[in-house]
Amino acid sequence: MEKIRLKLKAYDHRVLDRSVVAIVEAVKRSGSEIRGPIPLPTKNKRYTVLRSPHVNKDSREQFEIRVYSRLIDIISATPETVDSLMKLDLAPEVDVEVTSMETK
């Protein structure tokens, strides 16, 4: 039996949630057991930039990028499950990291 772990990341949580729903539906149609989606903590990156290129250090702008993450575990994955996941057309903004584990 094989266990597949999917870790999805995106800057927009709405696009991420749409992709998660598509993955969950595809896995359920193939008959595999699924755990998740588990929301992981949001990572915030803040950048402070001077507005002026020369003087006025007191005048600054702050920008923030948020990275949203979800975790999905597919228990007892079948070849049909893998085929349905490969055929999915997910949004290009979503980064998918796939890890395969062998279970006893």
Curated annotation (Swiss-Prot):
Any single GO BP term: translation
Keywords: Ribonucleoprotein, Ribosomal protein
A GO-annotated cellular component: ribonucleoprotein complex
Gene Ontology MF terms in the entry: structural constituent of ribosome; tRNA binding
Pfam families documented for this protein: Ribosomal_S10 (PF00338)
Keyword Ribosomal protein attributed: yes
Domain of life: Bacteria
InterPro entries recorded: Ribosomal_uS10 (IPR001848), Ribosomal_uS10_CS (IPR018268), Ribosomal_uS10_dom (IPR027486), Ribosomal_uS10_dom_sf (IPR036838)
Subunit structure comment from the entry: Part of the 30S ribosomal subunit.
NCBIfam families to which the protein is assigned, alphabetical: PRK00596.1, rpsJ_bact
Family designation: Belongs to the universal ribosomal protein uS10 family.
PANTHER family: 30S RIBOSOMAL PROTEIN S10 FAMILY MEMBER
Described purpose of this protein according to its UniProt entry: Involved in the binding of tRNA to the ribosomes.
This protein's name: Small ribosomal subunit protein uS10
